[in-house]
Amino acid sequence: MAQMTMVQAINDALKTELKNDQDVLIFGEDVGVNGGVFRVTEGLQKEFGEDRVFDTPLAESGIGGLAMGLAVEGFRPVMEVQFLGFVFEVFDAIAGQIARTRFRSGGTKTAPVTIRGPFGGGVHTPELHADNLEGILAQSPGLKVVIPSGPYDAKGLLISSIRSNDPVVYLEHMKLYRSFREEVPEEEYTIDIGKANVKKEGNDISIITYGAMVQESMKAAEELEKDGYSVEVIDLRTVQPIDVDTIVASVEKTGRAVVVQEAQRQAGVGAAVVAELSERAILSLEAPIGRVAAADTIYPFTQAENVWLPNKNDIIEKAKETLEF
């Protein structure tokens, strides 16, 4: 075991798969010589060579097209969209081509592409850099979408993503890159895509969340427990497909739920979670499902995000409202 940041854990996972499989290729804007904007791929080109870890032109659509072509020829491309806001430039290649390969070929071809994308608030980026677009990607048939909440999950989920025979969007919250360390096994391991993690068990209310909001939810749970409430916190880990069985089982136990996301409120992952609970756990609910999310506006830039991002106080307020209903 080693103490790692999320950047180190992702780098370790990439290194593991480059060693294990000669068909794994890593490419994107600045990922080679410079090791990426956040130095996530630092040292990989030097160790594995320019044929396997390389820079591309500043053309996201070209990166996606390259990944598609390599995938159907038997490679396992790991492509980076430098900031998730730039995914609009390559959306046709991802959702219109890569995601549909198995379907269009009648199962004779697959596209084992891993699409890495830094996203999320808390680091005061320019506009169109931090956008939470997981909801759009999750609504694209053929894609799996995973979002690790810390170093341990980051390594295990990335190895699973690269080994998947179908495309996986692997989203990396920028605030989590170096904000804390966890014990991470130095040997290889995988975490099942599509399986949520019960981060903390409780009996009075279920807080269901993912990404950076896991940390905020854990802080909120700690404060709520000082007031005598027993709080369960569930980290979805994967937002497509959602682990419906785990969240339903939790709500059937607690009778109350708050769904937390950093993204805008409408038509996102949180809305999908609420819909699933309404269909499958409605008779267990003792209060309306609470929701915590950002406002339905364009993502603000730099310091303005401080008043836009949900935080632990928002979660505590909504949880108490639900508990006292």
Swiss-Prot record:
Its EC number is 1.2.4.1. SUPFAM superfamilies: Thiamin diphosphate-binding fold (THDP-binding), TK C-terminal domain-like. InterPro entries: THDP-binding, Transketo_C/PFOR_II, Transketolase-like_Pyr-bd, Transketolase_C. Signal peptide: none annotated. It comes from the Bacteria. SMART domains: Transket_pyr. Thiamine diphosphate binds at E60. Gene3D superfamilies: 3.40.50.920, 3.40.50.970. It catalyses: N(6)-[(R)-lipoyl]-L-lysyl-[protein] + pyruvate + H(+) = N(6)-[(R)-S(8)-acetyldihydrolipoyl]-L-lysyl-[protein] + CO2. It holds the Pfam family Transketolase_C. Keywords: Oxidoreductase, Pyruvate, Thiamine pyrophosphate. Its cofactor is thiamine diphosphate. GO terms for molecular function: pyruvate dehydrogenase (acetyl-transferring) activity. The pyruvate dehydrogenase complex catalyzes the overall conversion of pyruvate to acetyl-CoA and CO(2). It contains multiple copies of three enzymatic components: pyruvate dehydrogenase (E1), dihydrolipoamide acetyltransferase (E2) and lipoamide dehydrogenase (E3). Heterodimer of an alpha and a beta chain. This is Pyruvate dehydrogenase E1 component subunit beta. It comes from Staphylococcus aureus (strain COL). The lineage of its organism: Bacteria, Bacillati, Bacillota, Bacilli, Bacillales.
